[in-house]
């Protein structure tokens, strides 16, 4: 659940909200310890406890598709440029490989609706495999 109490500030140069990492982790910690959580986050640097995760999926998109999606969402200027550059230079993928054991990092592409369906099936299969091993 998204709660405004976890925001530090709004209105930086990217016109976006900044999460208070400490408050978010404090909120998530008891839930994650129970297991079975799926966390959707833009950055893996956010989590100090790498052992919380059995799989990390990095969603990628072709640049032309990403550009159109971001424009459609109203991204402009530095926000648009930063998002495109992050994808171009594989920032999130490299961050995930640096932050977690490479064998638990999976790169998936979300270019089409078919990709999304295939990715859901792939993610479920990976999680089921990990569940049967543990």
Task: Please describe what each predicted stretch is.
Residues 20, 24-28, 32, 96, ...:
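Generic hydrophobic alpha-helical segments
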Residues 42-45, 62-64, 113:
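Short glycine-rich anion-binding loops that position phosphate/pyrophosphate groups of nucleotides
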Residues 51-56, 112-114:
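Short, electropositive alpha-helical surface patch
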Residues 47-50, 93:
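Conserved ATPase-coupling elements of RecA-like P-loop NTPase cores
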Residues 72, 97-134:
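NTP-dependent small-molecule kinase module
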Residues 35-36, 54, 105:
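Conserved acidic residues
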Residues 1-48:
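ATP-dependent small-molecule kinase phosphotransfer cores
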Residues 56, 60-103:
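A glycine- and Lys/Arg-enriched "phosphate-lid" helix/loop adjacent to the NTP-binding pocket
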């Amino acid at each position: 659940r998204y709660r405004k109490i976890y925001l530090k500030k709004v209105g930086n140069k990217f016109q976006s909200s900044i999460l208070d990492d400490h408050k978010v982790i404090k909120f998530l910690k008891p839930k994650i310890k129970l297991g079975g959580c799926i966390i959707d986050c833009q950055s893996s640097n956010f989590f100090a406890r790498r052992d919380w995760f059995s799989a990390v999926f990095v969603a990628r998109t072709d640049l032309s598709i990403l550009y159109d999606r971001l424009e459609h969402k109203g991204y402009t200027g530095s926000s648009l440029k930063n998002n495109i550059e992050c994808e171009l230079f594989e920032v999130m993928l490299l961050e995930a490989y640096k932050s977690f054991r490479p064998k638990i990092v999976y790169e998936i592409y979300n270019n089409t609706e078919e990709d999304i369906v295939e990715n859901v099936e792939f993610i479920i299969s990976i999680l089921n495999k990990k569940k049967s091993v543990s």
